[in-house]
Amino acid sequence: MHRRKCLRLLGATGAALLLAGHSPYRQWDVYRKTRLVLLASATDETSVRLAQALAAIFARQLPDSRAILARARDTNDLVRLVASGQLEVAILREGEAHAVLMGAEPFADNGSVALRTLGAIGDHLMVCVEEVPKPAAYLLVESMAERWHDLDAALVGRASGPRPPQSLRVPLHPGALEYYRGHS
């Protein structure tokens, strides 16, 4: 009888280990940690086009980043992915980014998310969570600035680079600030 309990326990343990190996969540965790995933809301065509163009720039300029675009179903899903720490970099309209930072409607159910600005692109901001390392943020801004002319003029407006205006309501990431101070 003791032998049966041991065999059941071993069988259950083996099954649990085998099933755990097929969890898509672990694969997603590894996937997103080995790539720069630029998140955009599928409901905002401009942000999708910007994220797509920026992902291509980062893939060329920073090949080790393995940059890709990911589309969230809508802006609220985008905010949830960033707030939960699943993804770190996104393209948002400035008003939306400010609402996320303040924990205001329509994103209040996610609480306040400590977003930081990397760059301004037309009416949109490229934002990240404040935990993004300073050197990584610097490299992203530098790459974006160096290849600014590759972005569609209709997307960037009259801006000559990604430097945000002084009136920005979402603070700059320290790595971005360092880049802009050295390249004024």
Each predicted region: which residue ranges?
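N-terminal export signals
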Residues: K5-Y25
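Short, well-ordered beta-strand elements
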Residues: K33-D44, A67-A70
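An extracytoplasmic/periplasmic, membrane-proximal ligand-sensing/linker region
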Residues: H149-S184
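A ligand-binding cleft/hinge motif common to bilobed small-molecule-binding domains
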Residues: E88-D109
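Short, polar/charged alpha-helical segment
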Residues: S47-P63
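A bilobed periplasmic-binding-protein/Venus flytrap-type ligand-binding module shared by bacterial periplasmic
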Residues: A40, L118-A136, P165
